[in-house]
Amino acid sequence: MRKTINCFIPYRESTAAEQTIHALKESSIVNKIYLLNIEPNKTLSTPEGCEILPVDSLTSSKTMKMIAEKADTPYILLYTKTSALELAYKALERMTDFLQDRECGMVYADHHEWKNGEKKKHPVNDYQPGSVRDDFDFGPLLIFNRTEFILASLQMTEERKYAALYELRLFLTLHSHLVHINEYLYTETESDNRLSGEKQFDYVNPRNREVQIEMEEAFTRYLKSINALLEPICVETDVKKGNFEYEASVIIPVRNRARTIDDAIRSALTQETRFPFNIIVVDNHSTDGTTEIIGQYKDNKAVIHLQPQRTDLGIGGCWDLAINHPRCGRFAIQLDSDDLYSDTHTLQTIVDTFYKEQCAMVIGTYRMTDFRLNTIAPGVIDHSEWTKENGHNNALRINGLGGSARILHTYPARNRRAQCQLRRRLCPGTHFLAPI
């Protein structure tokens, strides 16, 4: 059978590397295996039938261009992890079948992963035109059409240390498709066992700032290439629009947070303001005693306890329920059920900012702590990824504006006719505060 794949894998001497190399050699269509050594000063033994390539980074433009130069087969396999790879029966043949389509530039597949000693299914999503987040989950096994890979690499004119693979994928989409194979074709070992709620803050971790700057530069260049880069537009919002009994509402969606919900409510109640405000707690069918704790405030008119009749509301549905409640204030202020305000003047600061900036949304800086209020990694989240010049574009690339106190002007959020205006104003009209 014709050997149609050159493989490129990160390499360090380990049992996992041996297993991956063995799995690739078992395939009759693998031509050569290149081992990417990110520690060039370290002497490594070269497994039979392989070639070691010293690289500065697995995600640099130099590495991508080296791969393009070395590849002399129709397809390029790139494995992005150092954990052991197990291939399903004729998995590579199956993946390259899809690459025979002229419009297919890259394929990726569903897979299994070993996590904490248990083998679990790991399905991935179809790639769509708007799938531009730099952390889109393709899985670690990617196979490219060599011609398309080279064409994309030639469009990468800037030197990148961290964002080259991301940029290559973006440019790949300009002239080919990224195809998801809805079959479980391999197994890998998950090495990042953090909860998804912890992983979502990676993009704001100060230690990753240099990476994020490169990612933004690559994404901005891509937007320019497709004429999709939006210029900043300064549009003021009439924050006085609408009639409201309360100037502000602190909205706390909650489910099973018996340990923290009382502290969150008390933190809101101790706010000192020059305007009337209330607290809307949306209790999404808690079962751990949270409901009873909220019930202790039944005689406090400032605390509204909502219990949805529906059982299919996530946090977004709970937010929508609260914003459309007749007693919701002019400004809907998010407070997570395990969060506290940093001082008693936070609400006043937020509302003052709305009137000063005439903006549609305010987002606050915050600090990550443990239950004893000791600062934990990544520490202060100041959302440096947002700038007045390019934040509205960069927001498409990042994992939301995660964890922040997000505050909306209620009127446009409620009214469908005004929602198109809100969408236009939300990005250029978003203002960021110091820690709240």
Say what each PLM segment does.
Residues 56-70, 309-327:
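Glycine-rich, basic loop-to-helix element that forms the pyrophosphate-binding segment
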Residues 5-16, 27, 248-260, 264, ...:
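A conserved hydrophobic helix/loop-capping motif in glycosyltransferases and polysaccharide synthases
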Residues 84, 89-121, 345-378:
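Conserved donor NDP-sugar-binding/catalytic core segment of glycosyltransferases
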Residues 22-31, 266-276:
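Short, acidic, metal-binding catalytic loop of nucleotide-sugar glycosyltransferases
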Residues 37-44, 84, 283-292, 311:
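A conserved acidic beta->alpha catalytic loop
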Residues 120-144, 149, 385-406:
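A recurrent flexible, glycine/aromatic-enriched loop bordering the glycosyltransferase active site
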Residues 159-168, 423-432:
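Acidic donor-binding loop at a coil-to-helix junction in glycosyltransferase catalytic cores
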Residues 72-86, 329-340:
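Short beta-strand-to-loop acidic/aromatic patch adjacent to the donor-nucleotide binding site
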